[in-house]
């Protein structure tokens, strides 16, 4: 392997690190998808994939028309 990590995985790992370190706390709102895409220099679809993964694991919660929020729960799997 060459050590390549897909961008959506980088986003997932960064958000998880921010939650684990306390930089992001329960109830905190994440930046918008376009803002995150700009931050990671990737497409909105890539960021959406990462956010959806973190919603499935229960670490983030999307609120229609309001944004995406940290649940305070950290997934212990991969």
Task: List PLM regions with ranges.
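Extreme N-terminal segment that seeds HTH/winged-HTH DNA-binding domains in transcriptional regulators
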Residues: 1-44, 49-52, 56-61, 72-78
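A cytosolic small-molecule/anion-sensing beta-strand core signal
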Residues: 64
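Acidic, glycine-anchored pre-beta loop/turn
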Residues: 67-68
């Amino acid at each position: 392997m060459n050590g390549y990590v897909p961008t959506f995985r980088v986003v997932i790992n960064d958000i998880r690190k921010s939650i684990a370190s306390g930089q992001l706390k329960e109830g905190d709102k994440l930046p918008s998808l376009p803002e995150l895409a700009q931050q990671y220099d990737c497409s909105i679809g890539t960021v959406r994939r990462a956010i959806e993964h973190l919603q499935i694991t229960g670490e983030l919660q999307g609120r229609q028309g309001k944004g995406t929020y940290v649940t305070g729960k950290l997934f212990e799997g991969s």
